[in-house]
Amino acid sequence: MEDKKANIIATILILALVVVIIAARVSLKLSKTFYLIAGVDISLILAVICFLIIRSRYNKERKLLVSRFASEGRELRIEYSFLRKVAGVPTKFKLEDLEEATDGFRSLIGKGGSGSVFKGVLKDGSQVAVKRIEGEEKGEREFRSEVAAIASVQHKNLVRLYGYSSSTSANRPRFLVYDYIVNSSLDIWIFPDRGNRGRSGGGCLSWEQRYQVAIDVAKALAYLHHDCRSKILHLDVKPENILLDENFRAVVTDFGLSKLIARDESRVLTDIRGTRGYLAPEWLLEHGISEKSDVYSYGIVLLEMIGGRRSISRVEVKETKKKKLEYFPRIVNQKMRERKIMEIVDQRLIEVNEVDEEEVMKLVCVALWCIQEKSKKRPDMTMVIEMLEGRVPVNEPPDSDVVVVDLLAADDDDASTGVRRVVNIPKLQIHRERNFRLSSICSSIISPISPR
């Protein structure tokens, strides 16, 4: 705009000087005064023309310089973004940046108890998943847990925290920004009723892919338990929190319920939190939790991958036409003792005849070791990796009492009859009023604690 004004003023000035010369010629003829005025005017006209030429060249060079700086600035921002990725340093985003990246939070790709997840594209072209954590007390607790747990960890089988956005205002939600994982979560690939609900992906994961997912998740948990400065307990291991990348390799996500503990701590007491079917018995019995609680949840996930079904379901009893709880791990344990292990495998895998029976037996044995009632009997995740990769033989696990089933069945019966009862478990007697608040705990299991 300034250049345009300068050019207009210069043109008007030149025209004015030309008019002065013409007027002087008419009035003064060819006198000495005319030549003096003409000389001064011509000098001024030449000066204005020189000014325009110099200014034009200067503006052209300035535009080239600005363009080059802008290009270098973009490259610098991209390079800086790349360096932050390599270093694993989370970026603090403004809310406006996340709104722009997610198109006003319109692209919803997931929703659960800890928040909603939206797909987004950042200014540098990176595809991200933006998790919105809402609620004051719960949101703040989960936000701090998740940032503390994952900000400093880097592992190929753990989702990477790209950045975050927080506000001092209690009413504003908090955001966590993760790498976008294209094939969504494991549940829609192993449970038949999850693949047709409008979510991206969906289908039947092959046996080979399931086995690799088992190894990937084991490595992720082993890293959290043994290779970090503080032990990190995930405390919400389940198919919904296991994502699959473009090569169907597993990436563990959602650290909203995680807990950091010192390396010299063997177990800690904490409030019951998690998802039904994946909670270890020691958690329900208020004996304190440890990394072996994650091992238990992992074992349940293994069984669900093998069978293509949930660990807990309600089935109708033909005689009474009432529904009762059916616990898949108990069925697996029984079939293994009867040497009918192929009867529990996902029928879709049987139909395509791609299942190795020896691998099924190995995976079932590993899973049953992982869900032993006594946490000391469970292997740690490094041992699980050794067993899955064939470096350590897998022995047949001991028969299980399946404590969780007794707890669930007791509460299920009491809910329908209103009768108080004592649940007898080997070496353990639990009474409602004196030693254990069974009803409150089991009811929290039956209705999902974390409805995701």
Swiss-Prot record:
EC number: 2.7.11.1
GO molecular function annotation: ATP binding; protein serine kinase activity; protein serine/threonine kinase activity
Topological region Cytoplasmic: 55-452
SMART domains reported in the protein's UniProt record: S_TKc (SM00220)
Natural source organism: Arabidopsis thaliana (Mouse-ear cress)
Primary location: membrane
Modified residues (Phosphotyrosine): 178
Entry protein name: Probable receptor-like protein kinase At5g20050
One Pfam family recorded for the sequence: Pkinase
Domain Protein kinase: 103-392
Binding residues annotated for ATP, in chain numbering: 109-117, 131
